[in-house]
Amino acid sequence: MPDIRVNGVRLYYEITGEGTPIIFIHEFAGDFTSWEPQIRFFSRRYQTVTYNARGYPPSEVPEAPSSYGQNIATDDLAGIIKALKLSPAHVVGLSMGAYTTLHLGLRYPEVARSLVVAGCGYGSEPEERTTFQWDAEELARRLESEGIEKIGKIYALGPTRVQFQRKDPRGYAEFVRNLLAHSAKGSANTMRAIQAARPSLYDLADDLKKMELPTLILSGDEDWPCLKSNIFLKKTIPTSAVAVFPNSGHAINLEEPLLFNTIVQDFITQVDCGRWPRRDPKALSTSAVFSRKQST
């Protein structure tokens, strides 16, 4: 199995296809297999890359929680892009992977062509932050004490997962099987040191305002923890656009693969053609008629 040593750990990866590179970064409950519908589609025209984050076998599973963190995850991603000579790559992330994608755009913009930030926002809303951090710590504790088979089944039935179960029972069953094969230790460390500890999106506002990379923000309309923060990202990143998937939860690339692939393909095509726009500052006016300058 192909692996590469990056940032002090061994990470498993797969490359399929040839052309302009696209790298996909998985969510907490996923792994490299979560991107199969995208690899089958995009590898016909692009070089596609998937990998398992640290803590997700067959990648290395460090024992110490201090070996995990948002900055570490971002350094891992940048390291893979550089080591595999993918720069600059289109970068597509879901949930935890979307946070890493966004942080890559802030810290390593030179290695990216564009960013797709899907299902991003959990734990960012100020009124929900304490609850999210408590839930994350409790989930980590139970993963360690009760194991992935029991807790993974509970996690897979969360309020933003049932949409996938309803739409595609076979795909959902495969998602659960893959989740239950994860490392309890790696998942607990990831939940505790990355999910619970990462900064709120709102804490990044000043840096996001300066970001110049073309950015596509995606979420399901029933992925409640992401909706408010996605509007914040749209308002804050001057080169961003947002699309919301109807009747959809969290894993939108698996729930609605055709729609996801079509929207991302159109975005990447516009970027590669130099046609992705920067927002007109007048579009931020709260008036439906006058720009801020006109109304003062």
Which residues does each PLM region occupy?
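N-terminal cap/lid segment of alpha/beta-hydrolase-fold proteins
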Residues: 1-10
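Conserved alpha/beta-hydrolase catalytic His-Asp/Glu region
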Residues: 126-131, 145-207
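Short beta-strand/loop motif that positions the catalytic acidic residue
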Residues: 211, 217-219
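Conserved alpha/beta-hydrolase "acid-adjacent" motif
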Residues: 224-229
